[in-house]
């Protein structure tokens, strides 16, 4: 039986744009999420890009979210009841700088997060804060074309300096960008890039990547100057790729797929562009424009830890058109015949999580942090002995299998700081903008048509996860 470390950080994760609501209260500006059309943002480049409308899209569930902005005390109390040691959320950039390019921050926005962090401290819960989680201020997308414009580095610098200074005694763990590699697949949602995906050149896309990487290194530098005790990490979307066959060409295709993701963690951990990317740049006519000081900034400000989301693995082949497509998978790929799939077509692979942990740790020898993992499902509220509940044994089974593989990785020698399940309370899906895709231990009474009371109900998994935390993982190995 694997033993989890004594000070292992168990908890859950959310994002401001998916659950706070209050999109137009207390001085908050619009973000790219507020103009997301019904149906969400497609994962694949070349599909439609959300229109930058004059105002928020009226059927957008994210405008109200689950009203965490007004209910945070109730929700934090529920997290504490489960025994959370850590809670991951994000600061909405547009709540602090409504347009993104102001000189002075919005005090009401800063005060909200003061209140939230104080509430977490009351219960001894450590905040883990993402600085930018798919929430670029809309003005920066409209006026500057998001991270395609180098000016965003300066705006981001002002923002992170503001929040690092304000919360230097309240927050220890920080993430610079959520799933930073996702900008390759969802440039508007992830990078605020307004150019339609089908018109966006690889040159401009990878230049935007460079701007984000420089901004991340700059944030790491500033954070360590403001408080040397800060622990600052990068956050990537982790997705191991398996070759479809032992054919060397398929093995190479899997390696090339993984390199596109390793690029981001390599630069964060090693402080320079890896050699393997040079061929890709050359073959695609990409020439990254470095400003004076960029290389030194990257080299001197590597991260303290690597964090990642993990939902699935993919299969790669040199001739993918000859195989069935895994259309539900985040980044497409080939259907793996050996794996089951979720209701949304995401293939379920607990062993893949062990592989990711070992791959990252072998590669970097840095502490790791699993900051997203979970099962999106259509939950049904039923009457239980203690009131309405959800009999979500499928979620318990999913999480148990994944956490047992985490235990195996710990036995393998991986250094892991903690684990936060995604959407510990039901929230609006980032990719599909619906509430029926539920991840939480806590059911929120809100439906895809916007109806509902917003009441909170504990699912069966609530008590299960509470026991996992109370036993520091030992209950995972009990029938």
Per-range role (PLM):
Residues 65-77, 98, 109:
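Internal amphipathic alpha-helical repeat/solenoid segments
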Residues 71-92, 300-306:
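Catalytic domains of carbohydrate-active enzymes, especially glycoside hydrolases
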Residues 91-105:
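Glycine-rich, proline-tolerant flexible connector loops at the mouths of alpha/beta enzymes
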């Amino acid at each position: 039986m694997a033993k989890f470390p004594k000070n292992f950080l168990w908890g859950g994760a959310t994002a401001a744009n998916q659950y706070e609501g209050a999109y137009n209260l207390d001085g908050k500006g619009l973000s790219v999420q507020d103009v997301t059309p019904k149906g969400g943002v497609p994962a694949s480049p070349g599909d439609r890009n959300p229109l930058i409308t004059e105002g928020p899209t009226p059927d957008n569930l994210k405008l109200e979210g689950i009203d965490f902005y007004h209910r945070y005390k109730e929700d934090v109390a529920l997290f504490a009841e489960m025994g959370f040691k850590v809670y991951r959320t994000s600061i909405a950039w547009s709540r602090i700088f409504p347009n993104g390019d102001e000189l002075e921050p919005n005090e009401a926005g800063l005060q909200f997060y003061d209140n939230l962090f104080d509430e977490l401290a009351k219960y001894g819960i450590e905040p883990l804060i993402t600085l930018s989680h798919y929430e670029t201020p809309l003005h920066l997308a409209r006026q500057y074309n998001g991270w395609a414009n180098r000016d965003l580095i300066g705006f981001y610098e002002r923002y992170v300096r503001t929040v690092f200074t304000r919360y230097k005694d309240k927050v220890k763990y920080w993430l610079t960008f959520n799933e930073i590699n996702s900008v390759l697949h969802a440039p508007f949602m992830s990078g605020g890039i307004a150019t339609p995906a089908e018109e966006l050149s690889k040159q401009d896309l990878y230049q935007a990547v460079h701007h984000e990487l420089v901004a991340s290194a700059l944030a790491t530098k500033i954070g360590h100057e403001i408080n040397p005790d800060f622990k600052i990490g990068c956050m990537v979307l982790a997705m191991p790729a398996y070759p479809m066959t032992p054919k060397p060409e398929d093995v190479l295709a899997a390696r090339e797929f993984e390199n596109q993701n390793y690029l981001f963690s390599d630069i964060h951990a090693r402080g320079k562009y890896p050699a393997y990317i040079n061929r890709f740049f050359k073959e695609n006519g990409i020439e990254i424009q470095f400003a004076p000081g960029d290389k030194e900034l990257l080299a001197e400000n590597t991260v303290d830890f690597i964090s990642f989301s993990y939902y699935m693995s993919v299969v790669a082949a040199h001739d993918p058109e000859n195989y069935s497509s895994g259309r539900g998978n985040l980044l497409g790929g080939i259907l793996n015949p050996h794996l089951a799939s979720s209701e949304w077509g995401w293939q379920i692979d607990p062993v893949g999580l062990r592989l990711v942990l070992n791959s990252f740790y072998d590669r970097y020898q840095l502490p790791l942090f699993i900051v997203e993992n979970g099962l999106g499902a259509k939950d049904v509220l039923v009457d239980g002995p203690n009131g309405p509940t959800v009999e979500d044994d499928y979620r318990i089974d999913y999480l148990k299998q994944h956490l047992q593989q985490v235990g195996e990785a710990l036995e393998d020698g991986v250094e892991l700081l903690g684990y936060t399940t995604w959407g510990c309370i039901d929230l609006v899906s980032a990719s599909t903008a619906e509430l029926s895709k539920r991840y939480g231990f806590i059911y929120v009474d809100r439906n895809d048509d916007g109806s509902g009371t917003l009441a909170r109900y504990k699912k069966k998994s609530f008590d299960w996860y509470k026991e996992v935390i109370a036993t520091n993982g030992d209950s995972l190995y009990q029938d």
